[in-house]
């Protein structure tokens, strides 16, 4: 299953899942997506 955590590095409104995911990768997550304009990172747990 996946665990989620709000991104610490993402700045501004989250409008693009791709941008969010690439920021999440720099935070050692495996991906990410926008959720209510916030960038939420995901990784297996």
From Swiss-Prot:
Coiled coil: none annotated. It comes from the Eukaryota. Disulfide bonds join 3-45, 14-34, 20-39, 24-41. It holds the Pfam family Gamma-thionin. GO terms for biological process: defense response to fungus; killing of cells of another organism. Keywords: Antimicrobial, Disulfide bond, Fungicide, Plant defense. Plant defense peptide. Belongs to the DEFL family. This is Defensin Tk-AMP-D4. It comes from Triticum kiharae.
């Amino acid at each position: 299953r996946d665990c989620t955590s709000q991104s610490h590095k993402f700045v501004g409104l989250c409008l693009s899942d791709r941008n969010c995911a690439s920021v999440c990768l720099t935070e050692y997550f495996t991906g990410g997506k926008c959720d209510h304009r916030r960038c939420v990172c995901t990784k297996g747990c």
